[in-house]
């Protein structure tokens, strides 16, 4: 289930041809390819811009090691939780007389 079988693809192609016509499909595929190429170029330029900004910031500030971390005092030790002692169930004297 969920696997795309060859006959699924064939049915999709037939439906697309019926909906859009054989003449418009190559144009649609071409424009889709152009759009994907543009998106790829834009994402690459965004990554390059981020990398350039990081390099400029490092060059301007110079390499500075991180300041040492301040150790925080540990939480004060708490006594472990102790469950209250279990009590014997209270037996009603009337019930005790019936059980005997």
Swiss-Prot record:
Species this chain originates from: Salinispora arenicola (strain CNS-205)
HAMAP family: TatA_E
Disordered: annotated span: 44-100
Composition skew (Basic and acidic residues), residue ranges: 44-55
Main location class: membrane
Protein name, UniProt field: Sec-independent protein translocase protein TatA
Biased composition (Low complexity): 69-81
Keywords: Cell membrane, Membrane, Protein transport, Translocation, Transmembrane, Transmembrane helix, Transport
UniProt GO cellular component terms: TAT protein transport complex
InterPro entries from the UniProt entry: TatA/B/E, TatA/E
Family the entry assigns: Belongs to the TatA/E family.
Subunit structure: The Tat system comprises two distinct complexes: a TatABC complex, containing multiple copies of TatA, TatB and TatC subunits, and a separate TatA complex, containing only TatA subunits. Substrates initially bind to the TatABC complex, which probably triggers association of the separate TatA complex to form the active translocon.
Cysteine-cysteine disulfides: none
Domain of life: Bacteria
Membrane topology classification: Single-pass membrane protein
GO molecular function annotations of the record: protein transmembrane transporter activity
Transmembrane segments: 1-21
Location in the cell: Cell membrane
